[in-house]
Amino acid sequence: MSDNIPNDPFADRESQNYENPIPSREFILEFLEQAGVPMNRNDLFEALKLAGEEQYEGLRRRLRAMERDGQLVFTRRQCYALPEKLEMVKGYVIGHKDGHGWVRPEGSVGKDDDILLPHHQMKNIIHGDFVLVQPTDNSKRGRREGRLVRVLEERNSQIVGRFFLEYGYSYVVPDDSRISQDILIPNEHKAGARMGNVVVIEITDRGSRSRGMMGKVVEVLGENMAPGMETQIAIRTHQIPYEWPEAVEKQIVNLGEEVPEEAKVGRVDLRELPLVTIDGEDARDFDDAVFCEKKKDGGWRLWVAIADVSYYVRPDSALDKEAINRGNSVYFPSQVVPMLPEVLSNGLCSLNPQVDRLCMVCEMTISESGKLSSYKHYEAVMNSHARLTYSKVSAILEGDEELRERYQPLVSHLEELHAMYKVLKEARDQRGAIEFETVETKFIFNAERKIESIEPVIRNDAHKIIEECMILANIASASLVEKAKEPALYRIHESPGELRLQGFRDFLSELGLELKGGLEPSPTDYADLARQIAGRQDQELIQTMLLRSMKQAVYNADNAGHFGLALKRYAHFTSPIRRYPDLLLHRAIKYLIAKEEGRNQDRWTPTGGYHYSFDDMDFYGEQCSMTERRADDATREVADWLKCEYMQDHVGDELEGVIANVTSFGFFVRLTDLHIDGLVHISTLANDYYQFDPIGQRLIGESFGNIYRLGDAVKVKVLAVNLDDKQIDFELVETSRKLRGEGKTAKKRAAEAKRKAKEKKRAATRSSSKESATARAVPAIEPTKRPEQTDSGRKRKGPKRGDDDSAKKPKVKKAHKKKPHSKPKKTKRTKQDAQ
């Protein structure tokens, strides 16, 4: 046995696992750290005082395993070194449709630290691989380049794509544009796939420098244009879990349709309180119910009852593990991938009308000025008195006699909710919460699951009433766990970064608008801006630019406040059926309640509460933020595909729209009635060279002076639709902006201006000559002044920097130019180009 083994803190573990143990991984890493230089295998063997062939072979295998796992690097000099000493970086590959890629360092957020991998470095790796790279001295567009050292963990998920057969060879083109390699499929692994089928494959061979990747078909999904296929592709492409594990199926098999009587014991009985649910017409899972009454001394008492999911989904159970994996429900236009099985999400947990349900209640008092005066949380049992919809509640509040008579016992309570909402809205405006009136759309499908129409979602006061009630409950819940210093997830939204903020301010200045607040504008400053743009034709577009300037809201164990809502603390409490962070918060609150009553059992409570650590919450924060982004990306991708499918029937139509985004390669137009975006490529514009002004968000023609600017009203013709690329191409028909120059080119205008300047100079010279002749006839009785002096005898100051009009012009970046009379050129672009 080595003399170094006793110094190994893990020597006992190694002795238990191996008859002839060698130093542990941890000890080898520490040894190399202290050595300060890379060492080859023989040097390590001697330095660690090992002996015999068995220990030599054991060391060889351990070093190879550590190299495989990225703990060590095998250098070109046949030595083992620590990755951090060689400035190597571990991270995940992010592919690009053009063939190159990036590595995002492990634990990094955002693309600022990404390392570029050139095309040749991506040949045998794909999007999602976990790799070790070494940054090089080269850089591209200000980003570091890297060299692939090793693949530490291959992407083990399946890939969705289109199956093709050409010249006797079968291959699959991945639907995910971030995977640029085609995958060869041997004949014995086609699994009956036919030309054009959408298939799911597994990669069996990563290939080499001279040979491409190979795979096998594991599932044939069907024809490319089959109804619902776009959703199936997105689910698999974005690795959204959609099948229930066997352990989950076993756990839910004994769940009934009614709440067990023993579960109601010890809870506050709210079954007589007229709580109601208010949701959309097509909602199937009901998380929340509300009731409001006027207080005698002024103000209101508000009950917000939320489905008690934590009673059924206990920590570390099969249901819980799958809920963590999913993170949230994913709502596609024609399908839902739930976080919980339907027996819970639409059954036992859903607050369906006229049935007993377990709930977590946040009971609050609201002052006449809209201030949250007090709150308390408790476990209860309830019975929803009605399943109302937003449209019904809105109609009741507007005086619909038939509905008011049908729901007569509830009308007065709904009116109190409305009265409280008005006060809450005023309080929200006063604290400076940022509120946008954006237009959302929904797809209307026919019996064949094809889109019949695209309609805007109308938000009425009923939507806003529920929104304010949920915000209040979330504030109260965040306040409770923060005051008790109980680990939980907060919903944080940080203030905008300096770079994005400056870009947004430059954009506003071009429109004659201003965002106050200096380097750190407050939510109130943004709210003031929102009031400035209210009613403008370009209001929606300015709001879009404002949103782009802000950071994304995330889940975090550390409370950093919510900038957009102008709140010091905020957490998600109101949707545990569809969001895992809410379920975590319920468990934390239950633990606090049980702890106060002396019912907790160490970290557990009898009804599903649990005390987590802050380290636990760090993990859950990253996981839940990731699954939320994953769901957003997947649903956005499906919506884009459906919009393209819908627009196929409108090719050749001329439609009204507004320029929604300007780039160096053209501008995107948002159709006024359909709210669909398409690209007017720079190559389709009138013959001219165009410059892109990123500050002014416009394209400027060099010769004719034509300007295409964000917010301009235009008419476009639908030129083409590409379903595979999810791309809609428009051609400009006319614009509301008057073209400049009346047909004169910039050269002609410059020549004319130069000619006029010369004539003016000649006239001034002739006038000066006449004055000089007159001056010589008059005796000089005043002393001659120095050229740099004024009448007062002081030195005359030159023009200030910036006085010249030309100095005020924003710098512009050269755009891609189109030669006169060239044909339209088909180009590919992704949504990233538009952001």
From Swiss-Prot:
Pfam family, one: CSD2
EC number: 3.1.13.1
Main location per the UniProt record: cytoplasm
SMART domains from the UniProt entry: CSP, RNB, S1
Extent of Basic and acidic residues compositional bias: 739-754, 783-793
Start-end of Low complexity biased regions: 765-777
GO cellular component term, pick one: cytosol
Chemical reaction(s) catalysed: Exonucleolytic cleavage in the 3'- to 5'-direction to yield nucleoside 5'-phosphates
Enzyme class: hydrolase
Domain RNB, chain residue ranges per copy: 267-593
Localization terms from the record: Cytoplasm
Molecular function (Gene Ontology), one example: exoribonuclease II activity
Keyword Endoplasmic reticulum: no
GO BP: mRNA catabolic process
UniProt KW keywords: Cytoplasm, Exonuclease, Hydrolase, Nuclease, RNA-binding
Region (Disordered): 739-835
Basic residues bias (residue ranges): 755-764, 809-829
Residues of the S1 motif domain: 652-733
Known function: 3'-5' exoribonuclease that releases 5'-nucleoside monophosphates and is involved in maturation of structured RNAs.
PANTHER family documented for this protein: DIS3-LIKE EXONUCLEASE 2, RIBONUCLEASE
Family that this chain belongs to: Belongs to the RNR ribonuclease family. RNase R subfamily.
Name of protein: Ribonuclease R
Record organism: Vibrio parahaemolyticus serotype O3:K6 (strain RIMD 2210633)
Name of the gene this protein is made from: rnr
